[in-house]
């Protein structure tokens, strides 16, 4: 069995909770023979609270549900037009520490945005990726049994106004941005394959397979 191979699932537009549950079940059931996976998904509008999330950072959720998550970090928003990439990796197999994985995911986004002539950077004091002072990508992980789950959320072509109902990632007044501000044609469909390709490159080009859409 080719343990190094990574399977890539394209889940389309999905509610948050069933995907989160599936991710937990996958991680709990893993053993040393389980192949790593990358899940690409867009979510219906939802606020997710991180494990250390404080209720005061949810200002006026209104009609958007607030769901507790066990990832790191504070509250964020997911919605259509944002590409979420969940990384279900055996860190020992990949010879990665948690901090290295965070850096690798941030660099994946920086490299992807550079292909679209968008200059971006991570910040030491606030995980994620930024264009100037504005946040374009949120990041939150959980490690269980030496395996990662959760991942990143890149704003591409979405309605950003729900971010005004929260303090994104616990920072009051944090301004958000998205790829469409610089690249009007950008879409999750076109950006997702570039994200995956850049992540695989940083993982030293392991064999991979896109699974057929369900």
Curated annotation (Swiss-Prot):
The record marks 135 as: Lowers pKa of active site Cys. Pathway: Protein modification; protein lipoylation via endogenous pathway; protein N(6)-(lipoyl)lysine from octanoyl-[acyl-carrier-protein]: step 1/2. InterPro entries: aa-tRNA-synth_II/BPL/LPL, BPL_LPL_catalytic, Octanoyltransferase, Octanoyltransferase_CS. Residues 32-207 form the BPL/LPL catalytic domain. It catalyses: octanoyl-[ACP] + L-lysyl-[protein] = N(6)-octanoyl-L-lysyl-[protein] + holo-[ACP] + H(+). One of its GO terms (biological process) is protein modification process. One of its GO terms (cellular component) is cytoplasm. The keyword Cytoplasm applies. Pfam families: LplA-B_cat. Keywords: Acyltransferase, Cytoplasm, Transferase. Its EC number is 2.3.1.181. Catalyzes the transfer of endogenously produced octanoic acid from octanoyl-acyl-carrier-protein onto the lipoyl domains of lipoate-dependent enzymes. Lipoyl-ACP can also act as a substrate although octanoyl-ACP is likely to be the physiological substrate. Belongs to the LipB family. In the reaction, the free carboxyl group of octanoic acid is attached via an amide linkage to the epsilon-amino group of a specific lysine residue of lipoyl domains of lipoate-dependent enzymes. PANTHER family: LIPOYLTRANSFERASE 2, MITOCHONDRIAL-RELATED, OCTANOYLTRANSFERASE. This is Octanoyltransferase. The gene is lipB.
